[in-house]
Amino acid sequence: KIGVFLDGAFVDVTHLDPGEDLSLGHLPQGQVDGVLLAGSGDWDTGIAEMLRTRSKGGVTEIKHGDPHPLTTEVEHPGSLGTDRVANAFALQSEMIQGLEQSKVWMIVDVGTCVTTDVVCDGLHLGGSISPGLSMRINAMRDGTAALPGVEKEVWTKLAPFKGETIGKTTQEAIIKGAADGISAEIIGRWEILNEQFRDEEVVGVILTGGDSSLLELGRVMPKFADSNLTLKGYYAIFSHIQLSSNI
């Protein structure tokens, strides 16, 4: 996923298919002022070398375990995944609008895993990690003798998962069990947080991640979705690094 920012504003995004290699054709035309290459996994050194050919300011790399500017209460800040850091730092840096609706926010990133991160008055408190939709559906296939696999192309066509929660076929039951389970998990966490922060304000929810649009959270309010939240957080981290290096 490639995000482009101009004068601090998000202007464009390019999505790569799973397994698709990054190439110069995915990048904006001409030279850019700087590049941030970030992620929790490893990548070939040739990627950074390729990006340097299009960047006036070189390439900054951030990997899992690297120091980061997020203000957090977790015991081991370096153990946080880079996407979780970016999501929370987007809020700390006020990279998104609408945060005035609450002092307490739960960020829900629905991808390979479902991560939640709680930010209160700009401080990251921690969160949770659980299996994502594909992982849940595949686990039912791999862990049983009779349940079938369901390809992502099939269950995404049934999205969003609203209304009827009863599957009429085994395939529907698997999909609804996985999807409704995630929705119920998120709603349940939201209710627990509202009890925990009952002396503050109603907890807000920000949805992001590739599968976030497939869920139905019903009565959860305030809530909004930002599919580019992680990119905005990475940009905020990049700006912080650039500013710190110029001091």
Annotate each predicted stretch with a short phrase.
Residues 1-31, 123-146, 160, 164:
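Short glycine-rich, Thr/Ser-proximal phosphate-binding strand/loop in the N-terminal lobe
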